[in-house]
Amino acid sequence: MPVDGGAMVPVNHTGYFDFVYGGIPAFLNGRRLVRFMAKKEIFDNKIAGPLMRKMKHIEVDRFAGRGAYEEAVRRLRAGALVGIFPEATISRSFEIKELKTGTARLADDAGVPMVPVIMFGSQRVWTKGHKKQLGRVNVPVWIRVGEPIATTGDAAADTKTLHDAMAEQLHQLRLDYIDRYGDAPGAYWMPASLGGSAPTLEEANVMDEKLRLERIAKRDAKLIAEGKEPLGDTKLNDAAARGGDGDGGFGDGGGNGRAKGANGSDGTTGDSGAGDSTAGSPER
């Protein structure tokens, strides 16, 4: 993680605390803070919203993303670290999903590198469809920082490069994790490709698309009841063209903060291998 200068920090997304874990390497390496791009709905929350603004995260309106895009570019050029979840939503398969192009476009426009952060174990603390494992439960969360990736001006090609790098880094990190803690056949938090009971990437994509369409229908029904024009998918895509990737194009992350490790100390406990960290589950 660079100790100075701006960088996009794409983080793989498997759990609800990823925004905390994803900021740990930067904090440990120069006490830098990562400002995450987060969906407007989080800022609208009466509890989370004020905290997000105080921590100077970037609000993303997924139907009008231009303002957030320009703000992110401004901060990157000023030397900030901007975090993003390029998969847009939590990956139920715990594999790397298709990435949105926003990360590459932001990095290219700002003239900064993409520095991927890969983690494994966060889904064991709290993820979609499963109970929280909070408190001093000693769940190991491994975090690894990848090599900086320069952009070329071709957002599609750069996004593929980023995807391939993140997928390879995640694969190796999981093997190292299993080597340390052993196999977990049938475990909900283990990918199907490694013998777990998580859905495959294809199965997870079907589930996500179904839920996405249900959300659109629910939102449009509410708009119609209020006498307003439904937005549908078309206007969602129009919004993407105006300044982002539309629905979750900049990710759906939350705020960045300081995690408390399982031993009660701030931050994380260093683990073997350069660029690795191990985080305990946060205290509540």
Language model features by range: what are they?
Residues 1-2, 74:
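Short amphipathic alpha-helix with an adjacent loop that forms part of the alpha/beta core around
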Residues 3-64:
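Catalytic core of membrane glycerolipid acyltransferases/transacylases, capturing the structured
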Residues 66-284:
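Non-catalytic C-terminal accessory region of glycerolipid acyltransferases
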